[in-house]
Amino acid sequence: MRSNSCGELRSKHIASNVQLCGWVDRCRDHGGVIFIDLRDRSGTIQITVDPDQGAELFASAESLRNETVLQITGLVRPRPADAINSKLSTGEIEVLADGLEVLNPVTGNLPFTVSIHDEEPVKEELRLRHRHLDLRRERMSRNLQLRHTTIKTARRFLEDEGFIEVETPVLTRSTPEGARDYLVPSRVCSGEWFALPQSPQLFKQLLMVGGLERYYQVARCFRDEDLRADRQPEFTQLDIEMSFMDQEQILKLNERLIATIWKAVKGIDLPLPFPRLTWHEAMDRYGTDRPDTRYGMELNDVSDILKDMGFKVFSGAIAAGGSVKCITVPNGNDLISNVRIKPGGDIFNEAQKAGAGGLAFIRVRDSDEIDSIGAIKDNLNSKQKTALLKQTGAKAGDLILFGAGKTATVNSALDRVRQFLGRELGLIPTDQDNKLWQFLWVVDFPMFELNAEENRLEALHHPFCAPNKDDLGNDPDAWMERLPQARAQAYDLVLNGLELGGGSLRIHNAELQRQVLQTIGLPLEEANQQFGFLIDALEMGAPPHGGLAFGMDRIVMLLTGEDSIRDTIAFPKTQQARCLMTQAPAGVSNHQLEELHVESTWVDPE
């Protein structure tokens, strides 16, 4: 049907007869000659229809609508010198048509323009409702082709490293310790339910027990959670697991994987190895375990300097076991007014969204003089002021913003304010050259965090992470006592403030796995019910193993420069977890529900 793709034609094809297929991007009549921009996935080529080639051919071209599907036959020839279009890869040539067949006309009204020449923004809701049309747009086609290149590159790298791709079940059982599951009722096993996998975590560990040694999968995962711009109810992970490798070997292999992807897709040589921060270092310096290191304004813990200060907001927070931290805004005196920091201001609101009651501030003037509210200025002695300015590095013209209270709240508030000001003040460079891809491994996470509402420990990552050997010791009788304070052999890869993926070494000792499950409050009987198949496997010669998973939707979002992963997925859901094109989810018939022995108790409020 076609001999060439539209976008592949070049000067070397001059004098060749070609057959092309594609969509009419636009059609225009210039002085009795019709020019058709014919578009397919590969690009666009100019078709020239001359009346000298035949009246019927010319008449057919005159009646074409945009997005009509065509087959064109013709001769490749050079464009006149004054008609060369340097913006197109095919801009030095055109095809003189000698045949035109409409393969499918457009009979309905187009909801929006697809043409590469029309950059008019289209509302996302309209794009998602007519996604089949939206996918023809150059931007979306380019994004999906880049996604393909990214995944293809990852597959080739892993296969060259001895990994094999194995598919794991999509219908599995529901397990605790995660987001909500998507549940699927079983018709055959009445009253019982499958769950769609949130990750292939347990199956990939079982593959290691099964002796496969190196596994990967481009896995579909499902989580019933509240959505953001970078979240979807169904998403794609590059899932990797390997036996007989320590943490250092795993990190180095995956650095090479990421570097290979960036080289293939962006043509960039990433500097290796990636920097590393421990979890505690990241929290102390940035207030988050996924810091954006492209700009400064790091957090400073000034609790030791201000613990005896007469300003009770500060000294009281420290006495209660909390902390006082600050960030220094360069030239903040000129850039930020008091109104923005006080209640109702945008900076105040950012801190409040993170749970803080507000922010205190100091303005540094000439000769190291300071301005602030009286309660701070009057209670800050000369020694404290000198120590504060020295530790923060603040100089004349700078603004110091303080958070005081529970350390977790202070970290969260100042992290949010730091990110907000980084964007507002233009501290984050916009051109993405090699220096601005700031990769970072965060390592040595705590094994557990406290769930204050339920007054119990929860696994910070998941309950299958192996604890640090030095923290745990070799005496199984002491493990229960040591586990709550242990670090996990876990690691996350962060890029420019976004988590790309994470993983850990896994527990391969059955008794240790039981004790970890008990530490998070799972009774032994329930642990055996939920995870008995895993514990049984660990008792049958499980090798040391570990791995990680990368969020491919997010990686592609960053590589394309998009703001939302919805623009890197062919058929995404909205933030209400709906597909506007197919109108999913939708109701089902009573007969279907009866077969499943399921009854809906939902009542339409209208």
Curated annotation (Swiss-Prot):
MF (Gene Ontology): aspartate-tRNA ligase activity; aspartate-tRNA(Asn) ligase activity; ATP binding; nucleic acid binding
Root EC class: ligase
Alphabetized Gene3D superfamilies for the sequence: Bira Bifunctional Protein, Domain 2 (3.30.930.10), GAD-like domain (3.30.1360.30), Nucleic acid-binding proteins (2.40.50.140)
Keywords: Aminoacyl-tRNA synthetase, ATP-binding, Cytoplasm, Ligase, Nucleotide-binding, Protein biosynthesis
A Pfam short name: GAD
Residue sites binding L-aspartate per the record: 177, 223, 461, 506
Reactions catalysed according to its record: tRNA(Asx) + L-aspartate + ATP = L-aspartyl-tRNA(Asx) + AMP + diphosphate
CDD domains with a match to the protein in the record: AspRS_core, EcAspRS_like_N
EC number(s) from the headed UniProt entry: 6.1.1.23
Subunit structure: Homodimer.
Main function: Aspartyl-tRNA synthetase with relaxed tRNA specificity since it is able to aspartylate not only its cognate tRNA(Asp) but also tRNA(Asn). Reaction proceeds in two steps: L-aspartate is first activated by ATP to form Asp-AMP and then transferred to the acceptor end of tRNA(Asp/Asn).
PANTHER family, per the entry: ASPARTATE--TRNA LIGASE, MITOCHONDRIAL (PTHR22594:SF5), ASPARTYL/LYSYL-TRNA SYNTHETASE (PTHR22594)
Family membership noted in the UniProt record: Belongs to the class-II aminoacyl-tRNA synthetase family. Type 1 subfamily.
Designated name of the protein: Aspartate--tRNA(Asp/Asn) ligase
Taxonomic source organism: Prochlorococcus marinus (strain MIT 9303)
